[in-house]
Amino acid sequence: MAVTRIFFNARLKTMMILAAVAGAVIALRLVDIQVLRHNAYLKMAERNRTQILYQTAPRGRVFTADGVAVASNAPAFSFYYLSAGRKDPEYLSQLAHDLAPHLKMSEADVLSKVEKGVKTGKATLLAENLSTKSTMALQELQLYYPGVYLIEETKRSYPYGGFASHLIGYIGSMDEREWQKRDQSMGYRLNSKIGKNGIEKKFEKKLKGHDGGVFLEVDYRGRVKSIIQDKKWSAGSDVYLTLNFDLQRAAEEGLKKSKTGRGAAVALDPRTGAVLALASAPAYDPNIFVGYSDEDNPKQSKKINEYNLAVQGIYPPASTFKIITAAAALEDGHLDVKRKINCPGHYNSGPRVFKCWSTHGPVDFFDGVSNSCDVYFYVVASETGAAAIERVERKFMFGRQTGIDLPGEKAGNLYGPTRRARNKTYWFIGDTLNLSIGQGELLVTPLKMAQFAAAVASRGNVYRPYYVEKIVSNQTGKTEVLGKTDILQKADLKPQTYDLLFKALKHTVDNGTARRVKIKGLDVYGKTGTAQNPHGKDHGWFMAFAGKEGEEPSIALAVFVEFGEGGSSAAGPIARAMLEAYFRLNKPEAKKRNPQNKTAPPKIMTNC
């Protein structure tokens, strides 16, 4: 009996100890939950009933100098899944099945995104850049699937397609590597849209606005109970270019319709260096990167041509360079403009025969320039010497970059005896003759030739070209002026030299090879060129500057058509169309242009 009582007391004591331990564990757990981890569990509870739908701010717009929005924003919709909704596999599979056709995604991809949202407990973006057509069907599906929501945003839009595409560039989704490099205070998220090329890339920080977001209170089924906070976005700053809309479009259309559809056209203001037009063909349509995600866009699979021939293509300037040869001879005093030189169609230099493109007979300075007589310039160059020609080359900065703020600009190649001497190679009379007509090792970009035309038009001011005039903040209204005139160098030729060059180039337009740009009411000065190409058809050049009759030149341009053969026939019509567009002499009907679209605040479409 005593043994039994002792055994019973021991068991009772053990049970009491176990109960005490269990009670202590429970008490500690309660302390842990209610005190030590109170904030963590509170945040978890808040997360279960609060969801955030991010709203991407509209990018700043890009305008031409005459106020046309060439990069703007269009309405679009984003589609979210709120993780507070139902989470059972059958429901999620059916949801993916019904959504996939409207999102132009596979069921597996939709399900993967939904499951990711369930796992993270955050609102998950299923699709963006949706068109109005898809949103109508998705709005109906919201009635059957609590927890899926549409939100109205904007997407990038290029109303004029490939207009100045090599300058404006395009946007695309950033990858993880790019995201890690970005300033996170700017509000970037993985897959945010950023500038990938051109102005879109260069001015990314200015064009990108500050994103907003809608903080929602949702119930256990994912239905919206209330909007806790609506943080409005702020649009990015607007960029204003120096481009003239009609002029740029005339350049692009001309290149597109040319013999080969390949080339470049550049126009500058010879009074400031502002870029009035800069076109490279073939161009590309940046809309292929920002099309509606639910619409078929077969162009997206095509590789775009980002090569900017205007600043990256280098070619011999051909007969447009005869202006340099003429200037050198005039400066050196070896040229009597009244002296006539006979052109029998060829020029003998020792055992070599250098041909002219025609038989011109006796020609003086003005006829030699206007008829682009090679023999005339062979004689003048042999008397003047290559060193004098090279000196004038350097005055106009040949062989150097123009200084424009564009990536990948080529400097071209300066051609002359000094350069040869540096390379410890000989210079021959044949080199001088080739140099005199812009052939041989001399290479230039179309932009360089436009800069040269502007320098002659301004009587020696070699300007740094610029294409952005100002940036205007949509948040503060402040204007940041970027367009500043910068004279890189002064081509200090004698005033009489410039007078004679003007007269010869005017004679070329009125009576010579540049007659295609003779336009009533304008004083046009021009020069044609046909660059020899040992690998195929020759290239066509046209260089000109012009002003209203009796006024100083207000535009200088260079047109280049790759494989276009004759400069007059291939590049001349484009130059004429550009001048007519710039001076609006053809008096076109007022173009219907897009409004300076002010983006409406985003809206959330709920099923509550």
Regions found by a protein language model. Name each.
Residues 1-293, 314, 339, 387-397, ...:
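Periplasmic/cell-envelope proteins involved in peptidoglycan metabolism and beta-lactam response
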Residues 71, 218-228, 263-319, 324-563, ...:
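Beta-lactam-recognizing serine transpeptidase/beta-lactamase-like catalytic domain environment
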